Curated annotation (Swiss-Prot):
Enzyme Commission designation: 1.14.11.64
Name of the encoding gene: glaH
Metabolic or biological pathway: Amino-acid degradation
Cited HAMAP family: glutarate_hydroxylase (MF_01083)
Catalyzed reactions: glutarate + 2-oxoglutarate + O2 = (S)-2-hydroxyglutarate + succinate + CO2
Designated name of the protein: Glutarate 2-hydroxylase
InterPro entries with a match to the protein in the record: GlaH, TauD-like_sf
Parts of the chain that traverse the membrane: none
Record GO biological process: L-lysine catabolic process
Task of the protein: Acts as an alpha-ketoglutarate-dependent dioxygenase catalyzing hydroxylation of glutarate (GA) to L-2-hydroxyglutarate (L2HG). Functions in a L-lysine degradation pathway that proceeds via cadaverine, glutarate and L-2-hydroxyglutarate.
Any one GO MF annotation of this record: oxidoreductase activity, acting on paired donors, with incorporation or reduction of molecular oxygen, with 2-oxoglutarate as one donor, and the other dehydrogenated
Subunit structure: Homotetramer.
C-alpha cells in the first residue's frame, strides 16, 4: 500500500489492500489521505444500522463502538488499522473521508452514524457541552450575532486546535458537512505543525511552556476556566499544540505580544492548505499536530451550511504527552 510507506511504526498491521473503500493522497497535500467508500459499502452499512436511530447512539454509548465494528466488518477488517495508523502517523495524521451516496441533508442521520463509526474505530468522542451530546450540529447562515467566530461566515476563522478550554484529552477532531446552499468559498484551512515555517522558533520560546488561562464564551456552556501552555511535546519530544486565539487570556503585556506574534505567524504561513469538503464528506485529523480553520464565504442572502463535529481521544494505544494532555 504505497499510501502508507511513510508510516515508520505501525500500531496495528496494515492490510495488503483496502476492501470496500479506496485510498489516495489528497491533491491539496500529500500528508492528507482521501478515503472513498464504495456506494455498495455505504448502502450495506446504512441497512445494517437502520435498527438504531441516532438517539440510540446518544443513549447507549456502547452502540457507537458496535456501528464501528459493523463498518469494519463490511471492509473485511481492513478499516480500523488504516484509520488508527493514519491518525497516529506524525507524517500524515489527516484524512478526508467520503462515503459515496451520502450526499443529501435528508440523510443527515446516516451521516452521523457513519462518522460515529469511523471515530469509534480509533477512540471515543468526548461529551460536547455546547450540544449536550457526543457530537454537535450547528448552522452557518448569512448573518450572525453569536459570541464566537464559529458561525460568522464573512471572515476567516483563524487556525486553531479544538478542546483548548476543556479538561479533556482531545486527540482528534472530526468535521462533517451535512448541507450547504448558495455557497461560494468557505473551504477548510489546515496547517501541519511540521510544515509551519516558524514552528521551531515559537516552540523554543520561553512563553511556549508558560501556563496560560483559557476561557469560553457562554454559547460553549463551559463555566470553568482551564490552565495549560500553548505548546507541549509528544513522547518523542516533537511539538504539539493546544491553541485558539479567541479563548486564551494573556495575563500581561509580554504574553499578549507573544500570542499576537504567534497568531500572525500562523495566519501568514504559506504552508496552509485549502481543502474543499463536499456534502457528506468529513475531515478526521490529529488535533495535536494539525491546526484547522475556515476560509470566508461570499455573502448571499440564502447562504446556509450545516456542520457536525466530534472530538475525542485515541484509545489504541494511548498517545503519550509530556504535560497537560
Amino acid at each position: 500500500m504505497n499510501a502508507f510507506t511513510q508510516i515508520d511504526e505501525l500500531v496495528m498491521p496494515l492490510p495488503l489492500e483496502p476492501q470496500g473503500y479506496t485510498i489516495a493522497p489528497s491533491k491539496q497535500s500529500p500528508r492528507l489521505l482521501e478515503l472513498t467508500f464504495a456506494r455498495e459499502t455505504v448502502e450495506a452499512f446504512v441497512q445494517a444500522v437502520a435498527q438504531w436511530p441516532v438517539q440510540a447512539l446518544e443513549y447507549k454509548s456502547f452502540l457507537r463502538f458496535r456501528v464501528g465494528e459493523i463498518l469494519d466488518e463490511l471492509c473485511q477488517g481492513t478499516l480500523r488499522p488504516v484509520l488508527l495508523n493514519t491518525i497516529l502517523d506524525r507524517a500524515s495524521g489527516g484524512m478526508l473521508i467520503t462515503p459515496v451516496g451520502l450526499d443529501d441533508v435528508s440523510q443527515a442521520e446516516d451521516m452521523v452514524k457513519f462518522t460515529t463509526a469511523c471515530a469509534h474505530l480509533i477512540g471515543r468522542s468526548n461529551y460536547d457541552a455546547m450540544s449536550g451530546q457526543f457530537y454537535a450540529r450547528f448552522v452557518v447562515v448569512n448573518s450572525d450575532n453569536s459570541d464566537s467566530y464559529l458561525r460568522q461566515p464573512h471572515r476567516v476563522m483563524e487556525l486553531h486546535n479544538d478542546g483548548t478550554f476543556v479538561n479533556q484529552i482531545t486527540d482528534y477532531v472530526l468535521m462533517l458537512k451535512i448541507d450547504e446552499k448558495n455557497m461560494e468559498g468557505g473551504n477548510s484551512l489546515l496547517l501541519h505543525l511540521d510544515d509551519w515555517e516558524q514552528c521551531d522558533e515559537f516552540f523554543r520560546h520561553p512563553m511556549a511552556r508558560r501556563e496560560m488561562r483559557w476561557t469560553a464564551p457562554p454559547s460553549k456552556k463551559v463555566a470553568e476556566d482551564v490552565f495549560h501552555s500553548v505548546f507541549d511535546t509528544d513522547a518523542e519530544g516533537r511539538p504539539t499544540m493546544r491553541y485558539i486565539d479567541q479563548f486564551v487570556q494573556p495575563e500581561n503585556y509580554e504574553e499578549g505580544i507573544w500570542l499576537n506574534a504567534l497568531s500572525d505567524s500562523l495566519e501568514g504561513s504559506e504552508k496552509k492548505v485549502s481543502v474543499p469538503v463536499g456534502v457528506g464528506s468529513f475531515l478526521l485529523i490529529n488535533n495535536l499536530f494539525w491546526l484547522h480553520g475556515r476560509d470566508r464565504f461570499t455573502p448571499h442572502e440564502g447562504l446556509r451550511r450545516e456542520l457536525m463535529r466530534q472530538r475525542g481521544y485515541v484509545a489504541f494505544p494511548k498517545p503519550l504527552y509530556q504535560r497537560g494532555q
